């Protein structure tokens, strides 16, 4: 039972440690199981990585790797935000094309947001507008928060295909169709998927937000690794959001967005008004209740405690604070600019017991009853809470295919961040999942390969986890101590002292009645044994000789004369004991043979040869 308890305790400790490195809320499979596994060892990394700029294997609407080192086709915004001061309304954030700070892939570059606390806006035109019809929409790109993230976003906007779209004027109010990507402020971690649906009757665009993912997104913002974000919208009005090729959110455009696509069939009548006689009071004062005659409303809630007396030595005329007599006016004090100098106030040393006007403390008034109010009773005229009547919604419509959104023709990043060095790379917009997967294998795969190879060992991971959770050190010590205790208990068990009795008593044999024939047979056997004493003596000597030979083999040293004398004395005493026991048996036989009663005998115990 003790060992079972040890193993149970050890298992619980390991589970506690693993909980720090696992996301309990994630119900989807890990990336290693869903995506193409990449095995990397140090010998492979020692050779030169042959990175090639990804090339799409199928039709794409947009593809950008930034490996050329130039922002060809990208337009920096020159617009200003509305309703803000001119100094902070301009989009003056800086963009650069750089390699990753850590785990660089030779030859691979990305777009990096370089400024803190500034507005950034940059955009590019698609090769051709994407029209929502019978093909899926797949949007994919990479993000790396190289310095973590305090407050800011890394989402993209797909800009509506309109005649007035000018990329130099791209700002926060530019019409977009889809907004997708990570965003964080404080401890609120988000992965946006927002699309703007056009009302078929009014023509007004309304934002529809997909339900939030059911997984913990924190690690994607804090681990400083490059993560792959993918959005898939299908013509059957379903969607999927993937991170590192693992599904983290999916659902229906008809059911899993807020507010829903279809408006309610009925709405409250805006012209309906509550009648003046409508009574919403569930309880009313009892009209039959009368105030008791002895109810005194003039008594205060608290009165002075008359049992308390002013302490002796209380100084009524002394102030609590006095000017510091040791304070001096500074030499650089200018009364024209600083005003009249006054010494700082300090506690009055004379007020050790108390100073100022003394007042007794206040206590609750036992006679206080307060203002009398009649008790409440059920309102017999209660009509319930009034609500306007329902009327048919004049703007109601049915849209069974919300996938058919307005087309878009440009991709833009309009961001504000308190953290710099946000890395973007490998944008692609297409309609085939195989094209996007191949694009990721040629680009993002290399970053993950190198990051996994450079990942710290288990010891460093444990130490890093303990930096944020100091209590883990206790678990580490206990976890390490339990196996040591088990090994110690197995290898060096505690010796239990055995208690030996000085003497052991033998049980006497039970007296069994025997016949005369049996007794005569036993007498013959005893006489035969007495007639051949030499045989027994020779057998005994032979046994003693064998024992002496064994002792000589185990103990090569010769025995001393004293030891030989002791051994011979023991042999003589054993022989005398044996002869004495034989005489006693004869006497017992003779005594049992006489008498008129039934013949009984005590079973005799023969002496063992050793």
Curated annotation (Swiss-Prot):
GO terms for molecular function: calcium ion binding; protein folding chaperone; unfolded protein binding. Detected in testis (at protein level). Detected in testis. InterPro entries: Calret/calnex, Calret/calnex_CS, Calreticulin/calnexin_P_dom_sf, ConA-like_dom_sf. Residues 601-610 have a biased composition (Basic residues). The keyword Chaperone applies. It is found in: Endoplasmic reticulum membrane. Sequence repeats lie at residues 267-280, 284-297, 303-316, 322-335, 339-352, 356-369, 370-383, 384-397. Residues 549-571 have a biased composition (Acidic residues). Keywords: Acetylation, Calcium, Chaperone, Disulfide bond, Endoplasmic reticulum, Membrane, Phosphoprotein, Repeat, Signal, Transmembrane, Transmembrane helix. The keyword Cell cycle does not apply. Residues 317-350 are annotated as: Interaction with PPIB. Residues 1-19 form the signal peptide. The modification Phosphoserine is found at residues 560, 576, 579, 581, 591, 594, 601. Residues 258-338, 521-610 are annotated as: Disordered. It is a single-pass type I membrane protein. The modification N6-acetyllysine is found at residue 128. The chain crosses the membrane at residues 472-492. Residues 493-610 are cytoplasmic. It holds the Pfam family Calreticulin. Residues 20-471 are lumenal. Functions during spermatogenesis as a chaperone for a range of client proteins that are important for sperm adhesion onto the egg zona pellucida and for subsequent penetration of the zona pellucida. Required for normal sperm migration from the uterus into the oviduct. Required for normal male fertility. Binds calcium ions. This is Calmegin.
